[in-house]
Amino acid sequence: MISAISSPWLTQLSHFCDVAAFTTSSLSSLNTPGSYHLSPSPGDPYSHHESQFEPCPAAQHAYNYSGSNSAQAPAQGDSGTSNCSSSSSSSTPNKTLVKKNPKVANINVQLEMKALWDEFNQLGTEMIVTKAGRRMFPTFQVKIFGMDPMADYMLLMDFLPVDDKRYRYAFHSSSWLVAGKADPATPGRVHYHPDSPAKGAQWMKQIVSFDKLKLTNNLLDDNGHIILNSMHRYQPRFHVVYVDPRKDSEKYAEENYKTFVFEETRFTAVTAYQNHRITQLKIASNPFAKGFRDCDPEDWPRNHRPGSLQIMSAFARTRNPMSSPPQQNGTEKEDSRREYDRDPSGNPLHSDPTHQLMSRVLSPALPVLGGLHAVPLTAGPRSPPHELRLDGHPQPPDTLHHHPYKYPATYEHYLGAKTRPSPYPSPSIRGHGYHPHMNPTTANMYSATSAPTNYDYGPR
């Protein structure tokens, strides 16, 4: 079991406690007859057996699985309870209860983001598994209390099947149905928190996050990820292991750890989300899924930058610098000229949020026709994203004659990026201000009265 996860400190830890003994003891009851069942949640159709430990408070499970009549999954730990289920290591009636080491007996654990877990649990939590491995969301995070500040502890997690069933999702009824018996069991693995081992004071002073844990369906995975079967239900377990300095610590392996089970973290492993409500909730609550949000711009927070899809859509409707100039009538030319007029101070008179948005997200410099020098992006006042108007915007001309930028310097205001040197030296172009009649092919585009006269593309 342990060999699947290569940790440099694991070998050094061998003289403190027998980690292999703990792992073997913790996982040995996976297929052991008589192992006690996970406690039922109200309305959970799985559970028709008495639980042998006190369940942690959790919202009602809304998994609409049908055809299942049991939920067998072992869990081990101390007989006391905390904010989650803390189960007995002696599950069978003919075994004596193991007295826990005082270093772990008083440890309590509180699940972080419990309200979010409850919200997912009511819908039926799904977790994506991929060949390369996928992180969990919500992330498993806990706050720990009651450790000995000067003692060393290891924190680890494993995942146990809830039952011996395989499931499928019925879209017509928006419910999970039993599809048959479970696939062969995957290799049992545990995930060690990368900061293990550490002093109790270190663990208790901050929230412990298992954000590095990844789930995979690759049976040949050699990266130490947790291997799960898709379309099966799993229960995460959290273990606290006291690093016993005694040389014969393997004799006390069952005394030196405590296990916690949060039933609201139970989930179904999937390769793609089945319940569209789960998809929506993940997008709405995951800060890394902002690009997938499809909501009214009026609902955007003022400091929220819209996703790349909206940005590229706006960019596609504005202009293409390399395209040929379109033919315009007089009204369109006047609108375009007024759109890009500037006041004497150099500030753009227009307040077009699309171009202001482009000035924040495009590359540091845009090449000018002919490769003369780099044209900067404006650093004018930012407009809040909720004012973005993608429809009804007058189409600017696809030509650099109406370029909205004035000063030929590189852009220094986007995320503090350093300037990039222009591909050609600036002195060679000094004094060559742009004039629309320099190119005979474009001389007839403007009349004497409508030609823009305040465009100066020369360096300052």
Curated annotation (Swiss-Prot):
Matching SMART domains? TBOX
Q: Which residues bind DNA?
A: 116-294
User: What is any one of the record's Gene Ontology cellular component terms?
Assistant: nucleus
The entry summarizes the disruption phenotype as follows: Fishes display defects in the ear, pharyngeal arches and associated structures such as the thymus.
In its keyword annotation, does this UniProt entry include Oxidoreductase? no
Instruction: Give UniProt keywords alphabetically.
Output: Developmental protein, DNA-binding, Nucleus, Transcription, Transcription regulation
Q: Please give the tissue specificity annotation from the record for this chain.
A: Expressed in the ear and mesendodermal components of pharyngeal arches.
Q: Show the segment(s) annotated as Disordered.
A: 30-53, 67-99, 317-355, 376-400
* Intracellular or extracellular location(s): Nucleus
One biological process term from GO is: semicircular canal morphogenesis
Record's keyword annotation contains Zinc:
no
Q: Where is this motif: Nuclear localization signal?
A: 418-429
The record's section on PROSITE patterns has: TBOX_1, TBOX_2, TBOX_3
Write down the Gene3D superfamilies for this protein, in alphabetical order: Transcription factor, T-box (2.60.40.820)
Would you say which domain of life the source belongs to?
Answer: Eukaryota
Pfam families according to UniProt: T-box (PF00907)
> For bias kind Basic and acidic residues, which ranges apply?
331-344
Biased-composition ranges, Polar residues, are 67-84, 320-330
Q: Name one GO molecular function term.
A: RNA polymerase II cis-regulatory region sequence-specific DNA binding
- Major localization class: nucleus
Give a short account of what the protein does. Answer: Probable transcriptional regulator involved in developmental processes. Binds to the palindromic T site 5'-TTCACACCTAGGTGTGAA-3' DNA sequence. Is required for normal development of the pharyngeal arch arteries. Acts cell autonomously in the pharyngeal mesendoderm and influences the development of neural crest-derived cartilages secondarily.
List the PANTHER family hit by this protein, alphabetically: T-BOX PROTEIN-RELATED (PTHR11267), T-BOX TRANSCRIPTION FACTOR TBX1 (PTHR11267:SF104)
Oligomeric state and interaction partners are given as:
Binds DNA as a dimer.
Q: What is this protein called?
A: T-box transcription factor TBX1
Tell me what gene encodes this: tbx1
